[in-house]
């Protein structure tokens, strides 16, 4: 499983569950980080105009998938109030997004698994439909979102069958998401028409900016 392909996406105006997909999808909201750039707070539970960011992500993701898991490593009971199964990392030490993906693949009920970060409340309402299109080709392992020349590796859709491969990578000490992707057949899906949807909120200042409706840096 080697190489990376550049892909163009199928655009859909629908906001219901990924039309035309051949298999159901599990969604995983990644909320397992330490929020260091926001002062060590749990970012997914920070309020954006009165609602936790993770709740806003959930409202965008849930119509597109068949199951939602939340990967979190603290405040588990508060995350459970959002109505989803909450699954902490199996690896200790806050090992990063790959640890969250690993747990998601371990717990997913469906063969296709999409991940999104908890701090991106504006994610596209057709994210899953567009990422799923390249995986109609069985040789493709994983699809990742891209805007311009910038890939967004945490916005990915992959196959559950990759779990043993990811487990071996993590057991060998691998932690960098790009390094794992380099060993797979990855297609990058262009979202140039929705670049602002991938804006994430990393700092208290960016949270205040989002609350006032101003454009975030990089939009």
Report the location of each language-model feature.
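Nucleotide and nucleotide-moiety/phosphate-recognizing core
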Residues: 20-174, 182-197, 204-205, 211-217
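Ala/Thr-enriched low-complexity intrinsically disordered regions
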Residues: 2, 8, 16, 21-23, ...
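Intrinsically disordered, low-complexity polyampholyte segments enriched for Lys and acidic residues
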Residues: 4-5, 219
């Amino acid at each position: 499983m080697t190489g990376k392909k550049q892909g163009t996406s199928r655009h859909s105006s629908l906001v219901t569950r990924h039309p035309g997909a051949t298999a159901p999808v599990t969604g995983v909201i990644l909320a397992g980080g330490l929020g260091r750039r926001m002062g060590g707070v749990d970012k997914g539970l920070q309020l954006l105009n009165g609602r936790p960011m993770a709740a806003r992500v959930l409202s965008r993701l849930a119509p597109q998938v068949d199951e939602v898991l939340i990967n979190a490593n603290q405040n588990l009971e508060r995350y459970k109030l959002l109505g989803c199964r909450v699954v902490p990392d199996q690896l200790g030490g806050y090992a990063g997004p790959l640890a969250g993906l690993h747990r998601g693949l371990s717990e997913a009920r469906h063969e296709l698994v999409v991940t999104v970060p908890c701090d991106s409340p504006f994610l596209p309402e057709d994210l899953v439909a567009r990422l799923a299109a390249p995986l109609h080709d069985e040789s493709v392992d994983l699809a990742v979102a891209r805007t311009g020349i910038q890939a967004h590796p945490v916005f990915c859709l992959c196959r559950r069958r990759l779990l043993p491969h990811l487990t071996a990578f993590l057991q060998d000490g691998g932690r960098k998401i790009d390094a794992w992707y380099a060993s797979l057949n990855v297609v990058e899906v262009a979202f140039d028409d929705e670049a602002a949807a991938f804006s994430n909120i990393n700092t208290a200042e960016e949270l205040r900016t989002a609350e006032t409706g101003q454009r975030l840096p990089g939009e």
